[in-house]
Amino acid sequence: MHVKAETVLALLTPAPPSVVGQHVVDLSGDGWTLSSTALNRTVPGHLPSQVHLDLFEAGVIDIMASMILTFVGLRMPIGRIPATRLKAYFESTWLVFDGLDTFATITFCDQHVGSTDNQFRQHHFDVSQILKECKQDPVLRINFGSAPNIANTIAKSPDAEEWPPGVQITNEYPNRWYIRKEQSDFGWDWGPAFAPVGPWKPSYIVQNSHAELYVLNTDIDIYRQGQINYLPPDQSQPWIVNASIDFLGPVPCKPSMSIEIKDAATGSVLSSGLLQNVTVSGKSITGTTTIDGDAPKLWWPSGMGKQNLYNVTITVQNDMKKSLAKVTKRTGFRTIFLNQRNITDDQLAQGIAPGANWHFEINGYEFYAKGSNIIPPDAFWPRVTQARMARLFDAVTAGNQNMLRVWASGAYLHDFIYDLADEKGILLWSEFQFSDALYPVNDAFLENVAAEVVYNVRRVNHHPSLALWAGGNEIESLMLPMARRADPTGYSKYIGEYEKLYISLILPLVYENTRSITYSPSSTTEGYLYVNLSAPVPMAERYSNTTPGSYYGDTDYYNYDTSVSFDYNHYPVGRFANEFGFHSMPSLQTWQQAVDPEDLQFNSSVVVLRNHHYTAGGLFTDNFKNSSKGMGEMTMGVEAYYPIPSKSDSVANFSAWCHATQLFQADLYKSQIQFYRRGSGMPERQLGSLYWQLEDIWQAPTWAGIEYDGRWKVLHYVARDIYQPIIVSPFWNYTTGRLEVYVTSDLWEPAQGTVNLTWVDLSGKSIANNAGTPETVSFTVGALNTTNIYTTNISELSLPDLKDSILILSLSGEGRLPNASSKKAFVHQNHFTPVFPKDLSLKDPKLEVSYSPESRKFTVQATGGVSLYTWLDYPAGAVGYFEANAFVLLPGVPKEVSFVAQEGNVTDDWLQRVTVQSLWDQKVRD
């Protein structure tokens, strides 16, 4: 079952032989056709695109009907071609494909050109001779095969590798691990299984004269002299700029390379001249230069300084000084290092527990990584635009995040996404596309992976936002233990295969193409014992070779037992938290984008089936059993801690339940983030919190903090608040009654200030004698540290009614942001209640909201009582965020809040439809 498309490429009249140069035809745009023998349909096509998108635009399928889309992914390959013009007088003609998803067969002038089997590689084919022999107007055809069908065929082959039953994780389509395609296309617990195919990235026809070079890829590596990937760089050393280009065309005779480095903001020249040590290896030309260590302005992550960027132009010349190729890339000067070295004696003397470090250092400075995990922002990458990603990354920096982990088994991010991260100061922990499976290690598979690794490492290496390369997701922490339990006697085999792929193959390829980036074989590890680059397995992982009382590596934590959600004794103690979370429902407005009105019920079949936690484990369209488990977990979380919605209007009740699941999710993440950040001053010296997950791929219950269209859930607001540089946090052991209050800072210098501790009842009246609690406590908190400012036991406080009490914690301090010239004021507010929200004697806060055109701000005030989880909500028609939300509001203390519009039309009518509610409204019947 194939789809064919074709368009004529008309040849021009040949030009004189003296014509030289280069002709590049961008095949992007309309003019393609998509045809299917399976559906007996031919429709207009586009490039870049994928089959589902063109069929949807032609009205053949409903893109919201996930079961139909799954069928399309299984049954429909695709072919395309745009109309354009070629020139007959060039000596060489190449087809260049930046991304074909995944199994494609290419023909040109009815001649077979080649085939592809890797979504993540760039492919190029020489069609010079085919074009010269073409007797008619040339036609380009690309036929795509069904990835699930081909994966199944590979799995059935006699020489296919096999693993113990129950080890490989199938979400919907099976056998994803046999092929090099986006693994989440086969289904995941936060997204659909559409398995799209098509030319998902741009494609070109390149025609060269006898001398010209076409640049396929560019690797610019900037590092300190003597820097080695797994060791801390010496910040006193000069900078080395290593420039390497991969090209099409004849190998030039005695080539030279020149460089010009300009400040991207001012245009001033930092350095120019010839590169040294120019070498040619295969189809790559490489040269280096040295820059004085203090000459460039450094690039810093968000919150730590400016994002200084430079444009680097590389020119290749032949021995006659004729320019053969020129390429410009924007980059920055910084060092980023993942420190996994053993704890030193000096660190032990500071009170840091023994073991090994696991934290990042930027330009020689330890910092606290605050952020989340980013998944594919759409099931179809051609729909992911620069404007859309700019809005998402604006939300990241507005949320006080400085790092995103680019989760493995989506896709390697486009260059424009790294460009945005460079501009906004967002570090991108990047991973190779392997996740939650064991993978083959046969020669053909490894050869395919090697090309994928080299291409992508070189492609993105110039971006200062690139923070790390990790081998894959949860391979060492989840998959190897699963294999050990399933087949204890064969465990050494699986360890050997893991090391063959992620250490013996990928690690040297990374190190050969960059000296500026650290590599970790897996997202979650205990770190390494030693590195010996001359050994067959160059990195010896620690695995379970740990010592009690010592800490190693990063942590990955999910616990769906809601009875212990807020018991921080259950949270993992480690050096870095790279995954943790709990799912919640999206808002009513988001559900309305994808679900018919009659299905807007918490347990409607449509809503339940869009919940893929837990996944079907196969191609089952009625996964009620597993989906209901995930729905039940959200329900139990709400019922255990929050007022249970019971509204007479079914849609209002559905909306209230959606909001309640978000409250639980946000409070759980807040509890964990506070705990992990406090660890910066504890023996574990914990220096990172990346929660799961940043954003949604569609409208469904997931772990996301930002919904599919960009609307913030409660989580993103709460994370924004608790990711501020200096915070005050309560820690309550509800079993013993012990209450501790900590101030935590991620500044690089000590900070000072005061915390006001104020007990009031839920009508807003002060509790007598402040319940025996000091009203003000002064603090000094060290750099990247935490300090306990108050400890008590609830039983020792003079609280007339625990259910009618709330402690307001208000911090006011002063400190200096990293690389800032002067100190600034910091404020933070938190709260604590000695019972869970469902047990509080809530009062109607009688909330009011108004908008002032003059100040362009909303004013929210409570006149009847304390408003908990004060929630401003906006109608459809625009996307943006409030500068504060989900806050505590005391009666008589109005709060002004701005709205930042990111997309859409904010009209007067729209402004008047902004609403406000609180926890009180969750329990009130309308």
Swiss-Prot record:
<keyword id="KW-0732">Signal</keyword>
<feature type="glycosylation site" description="N-linked (GlcNAc...) asparagine">
    <location>
        <position position="242"/>
    </location>
</feature>
<keyword id="KW-0119">Carbohydrate metabolism</keyword>
<feature type="glycosylation site" description="N-linked (GlcNAc...) asparagine">
    <location>
        <position position="40"/>
    </location>
</feature>
<protein>
    <recommendedName>
        <fullName>Beta-mannosidase A</fullName>
        <ecNumber>3.2.1.25</ecNumber>
    </recommendedName>
</protein>
<dbReference type="GO" id="GO:0004567">
    <property type="term" value="F:beta-mannosidase activity"/>
</dbReference>
<dbReference type="Pfam" id="PF22666">
    <property type="entry name" value="Glyco_hydro_2_N2"/>
</dbReference>
<keyword id="KW-0326">Glycosidase</keyword>
<dbReference type="InterPro" id="IPR054593">
    <property type="entry name" value="Beta-mannosidase-like_N2"/>
</dbReference>
<dbReference type="Pfam" id="PF00703">
    <property type="entry name" value="Glyco_hydro_2"/>
</dbReference>
<comment type="pathway">
    <text>Glycan metabolism; N-glycan degradation.</text>
</comment>
<feature type="glycosylation site" description="N-linked (GlcNAc...) asparagine">
    <location>
        <position position="733"/>
    </location>
</feature>
<feature type="glycosylation site" description="N-linked (GlcNAc...) asparagine">
    <location>
        <position position="532"/>
    </location>
</feature>
<dbReference type="InterPro" id="IPR041625">
    <property type="entry name" value="Beta-mannosidase_Ig"/>
</dbReference>
<feature type="glycosylation site" description="N-linked (GlcNAc...) asparagine">
    <location>
        <position position="626"/>
    </location>
</feature>
<feature type="glycosylation site" description="N-linked (GlcNAc...) asparagine">
    <location>
        <position position="603"/>
    </location>
</feature>
<feature type="glycosylation site" description="N-linked (GlcNAc...) asparagine">
    <location>
        <position position="819"/>
    </location>
</feature>
<dbReference type="InterPro" id="IPR008979">
    <property type="entry name" value="Galactose-bd-like_sf"/>
</dbReference>
<feature type="glycosylation site" description="N-linked (GlcNAc...) asparagine">
    <location>
        <position position="785"/>
    </location>
</feature>
<dbReference type="Pfam" id="PF17786">
    <property type="entry name" value="Mannosidase_ig"/>
</dbReference>
<feature type="glycosylation site" description="N-linked (GlcNAc...) asparagine">
    <location>
        <position position="756"/>
    </location>
</feature>
<keyword id="KW-0964">Secreted</keyword>
<dbReference type="GO" id="GO:0005576">
    <property type="term" value="C:extracellular region"/>
</dbReference>
<dbReference type="GO" id="GO:0006516">
    <property type="term" value="P:glycoprotein catabolic process"/>
</dbReference>
<keyword id="KW-0378">Hydrolase</keyword>
<feature type="glycosylation site" description="N-linked (GlcNAc...) asparagine">
    <location>
        <position position="905"/>
    </location>
</feature>
<dbReference type="Pfam" id="PF17753">
    <property type="entry name" value="Ig_mannosidase"/>
</dbReference>
<comment type="similarity">
    <text>Belongs to the glycosyl hydrolase 2 family. Beta-mannosidase A subfamily.</text>
</comment>
<dbReference type="GO" id="GO:0000272">
    <property type="term" value="P:polysaccharide catabolic process"/>
</dbReference>
<keyword id="KW-0624">Polysaccharide degradation</keyword>
<keyword id="KW-0325">Glycoprotein</keyword>
<dbReference type="InterPro" id="IPR017853">
    <property type="entry name" value="Glycoside_hydrolase_SF"/>
</dbReference>
<comment type="subunit">
    <text>Homodimer.</text>
</comment>
<feature type="signal peptide">
    <location>
        <begin position="1"/>
        <end position="21"/>
    </location>
</feature>
<dbReference type="InterPro" id="IPR006102">
    <property type="entry name" value="Glyco_hydro_2_Ig-like"/>
</dbReference>
<feature type="glycosylation site" description="N-linked (GlcNAc...) asparagine">
    <location>
        <position position="277"/>
    </location>
</feature>
<feature type="glycosylation site" description="N-linked (GlcNAc...) asparagine">
    <location>
        <position position="342"/>
    </location>
</feature>
<dbReference type="InterPro" id="IPR050887">
    <property type="entry name" value="Beta-mannosidase_GH2"/>
</dbReference>
<dbReference type="InterPro" id="IPR036156">
    <property type="entry name" value="Beta-gal/glucu_dom_sf"/>
</dbReference>
<feature type="glycosylation site" description="N-linked (GlcNAc...) asparagine">
    <location>
        <position position="311"/>
    </location>
</feature>
<feature type="glycosylation site" description="N-linked (GlcNAc...) asparagine">
    <location>
        <position position="653"/>
    </location>
</feature>
<feature type="active site" description="Proton donor">
    <location>
        <position position="474"/>
    </location>
</feature>
